[in-house]
Amino acid sequence: MRSVRDDRAVRTVVAKVAHDISARPPLRLDVGQQVDVGDRDTEWPEFVFVTASQGSGWVPARHLSASSGTAVVVTTYDTTELPTQVGDVLEVVVEDLTSGWLWCRSSEGREGWVPVKTLEAR
Protein backbone atom coordinates (compact mmCIF):
# COMPACT_ATOMS: atom_id res chain seq x y z
CA MET A 1 0.00 0.00 0.00
CA ARG A 2 1.29 3.46 -0.83
CA SER A 3 2.04 6.04 1.78
CA VAL A 4 -0.98 8.21 2.54
CA ARG A 5 1.18 11.25 1.72
CA ASP A 6 1.97 10.08 -1.84
CA ASP A 7 0.89 12.80 -4.30
CA ARG A 8 0.30 10.54 -7.29
CA ALA A 9 -3.30 9.66 -8.07
CA VAL A 10 -4.07 6.04 -8.94
CA ARG A 11 -7.37 6.81 -10.71
CA THR A 12 -10.40 9.09 -10.62
CA VAL A 13 -13.79 8.18 -9.11
CA VAL A 14 -17.17 9.86 -8.58
CA ALA A 15 -19.28 9.79 -5.43
CA LYS A 16 -22.56 8.01 -6.19
CA VAL A 17 -23.73 8.32 -2.56
CA ALA A 18 -22.92 11.08 -0.06
CA HIS A 19 -20.52 10.14 2.73
CA ASP A 20 -20.88 11.94 6.06
CA ILE A 21 -17.99 11.76 8.49
CA SER A 22 -18.21 10.86 12.16
CA ALA A 23 -18.06 13.55 14.82
CA ARG A 24 -15.07 11.78 16.39
CA PRO A 25 -11.78 13.67 15.75
CA PRO A 26 -9.34 11.86 13.43
CA LEU A 27 -6.72 9.66 15.06
CA ARG A 28 -3.16 9.25 13.77
CA LEU A 29 -1.29 6.19 14.99
CA ASP A 30 2.47 5.80 14.64
CA VAL A 31 4.57 2.63 14.47
CA GLY A 32 5.45 1.39 17.95
CA GLN A 33 2.56 3.15 19.66
CA GLN A 34 0.60 1.07 22.18
CA VAL A 35 -3.22 0.93 21.94
CA ASP A 36 -6.07 -0.87 23.66
CA VAL A 37 -8.11 -2.91 21.19
CA GLY A 38 -11.87 -3.14 21.62
CA ASP A 39 -14.69 -4.56 19.54
CA ARG A 40 -14.58 -5.57 15.88
CA ASP A 41 -16.92 -3.57 13.64
CA THR A 42 -19.95 -5.53 12.38
CA GLU A 43 -20.34 -3.54 9.13
CA TRP A 44 -16.60 -3.33 8.39
CA PRO A 45 -15.14 -6.62 9.76
CA GLU A 46 -11.54 -5.63 8.95
CA PHE A 47 -11.77 -2.83 11.55
CA VAL A 48 -11.34 -2.88 15.33
CA PHE A 49 -11.99 -0.01 17.73
CA VAL A 50 -8.81 1.24 19.38
CA THR A 51 -8.12 3.64 22.21
CA ALA A 52 -4.79 5.47 22.29
CA SER A 53 -3.40 8.22 24.51
CA GLN A 54 -4.60 10.90 22.05
CA GLY A 55 -8.07 9.51 21.28
CA SER A 56 -9.94 6.58 19.79
CA GLY A 57 -11.18 5.34 16.43
CA TRP A 58 -11.61 2.47 13.98
CA VAL A 59 -8.46 0.92 12.50
CA PRO A 60 -7.91 -2.10 10.22
CA ALA A 61 -6.69 -4.90 12.51
CA ARG A 62 -3.77 -5.72 10.19
CA HIS A 63 -2.10 -2.43 11.27
CA LEU A 64 -1.80 -3.82 14.81
CA SER A 65 0.27 -6.57 16.44
CA ALA A 66 -2.88 -8.13 17.96
CA SER A 67 -6.63 -7.92 17.28
CA SER A 68 -7.66 -7.89 20.95
CA GLY A 69 -6.34 -6.70 24.31
CA THR A 70 -3.28 -4.46 24.14
CA ALA A 71 -1.51 -4.11 20.78
CA VAL A 72 1.35 -2.24 19.18
CA VAL A 73 0.86 -0.29 15.95
CA VAL A 74 2.90 -1.96 13.17
CA THR A 75 1.94 0.42 10.32
CA THR A 76 1.29 4.14 10.58
CA TYR A 77 -2.43 4.81 10.13
CA ASP A 78 -4.58 7.96 9.92
CA THR A 79 -8.36 7.65 10.48
CA THR A 80 -9.23 10.93 8.69
CA GLU A 81 -12.37 10.54 6.56
CA LEU A 82 -13.31 12.72 3.60
CA PRO A 83 -16.94 13.86 3.44
CA THR A 84 -18.47 13.67 -0.05
CA GLN A 85 -21.59 14.75 -1.88
CA VAL A 86 -23.17 12.94 -4.83
CA GLY A 87 -21.25 13.87 -7.98
CA ASP A 88 -17.98 14.83 -6.27
CA VAL A 89 -15.00 13.88 -8.43
CA LEU A 90 -12.12 12.46 -6.39
CA GLU A 91 -8.58 11.31 -7.09
CA VAL A 92 -7.74 7.96 -5.51
CA VAL A 93 -4.32 8.19 -3.85
CA VAL A 94 -4.31 4.89 -1.90
CA GLU A 95 -6.36 1.79 -2.67
CA ASP A 96 -7.09 -0.36 0.38
CA LEU A 97 -9.61 -2.76 -1.10
CA THR A 98 -9.12 -5.25 1.76
CA SER A 99 -10.75 -2.82 4.16
CA GLY A 100 -13.25 -1.46 1.62
CA TRP A 101 -11.97 2.13 1.79
CA LEU A 102 -9.93 4.41 -0.50
CA TRP A 103 -7.74 7.38 0.51
CA CYS A 104 -8.96 10.13 -1.82
CA ARG A 105 -8.21 13.76 -2.62
CA SER A 106 -10.98 16.25 -3.45
CA SER A 107 -10.74 19.01 -6.05
CA GLU A 108 -10.15 21.41 -3.12
CA GLY A 109 -7.10 19.38 -2.03
CA ARG A 110 -8.67 17.82 1.08
CA GLU A 111 -7.80 14.16 1.73
CA GLY A 112 -9.22 11.26 3.68
CA TRP A 113 -10.77 7.80 3.59
CA VAL A 114 -14.00 7.20 1.63
CA PRO A 115 -15.91 3.87 1.51
CA VAL A 116 -15.53 2.11 -1.84
CA LYS A 117 -19.26 1.27 -1.85
CA THR A 118 -20.09 5.01 -2.13
CA LEU A 119 -17.95 5.50 -5.26
CA GLU A 120 -18.01 4.53 -8.91
CA ALA A 121 -15.44 4.64 -11.71
CA ARG A 122 -15.36 7.78 -13.77
Model segments located where?
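Src homology 3 (SH3)-mediated interaction modules
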Residues: 1-122
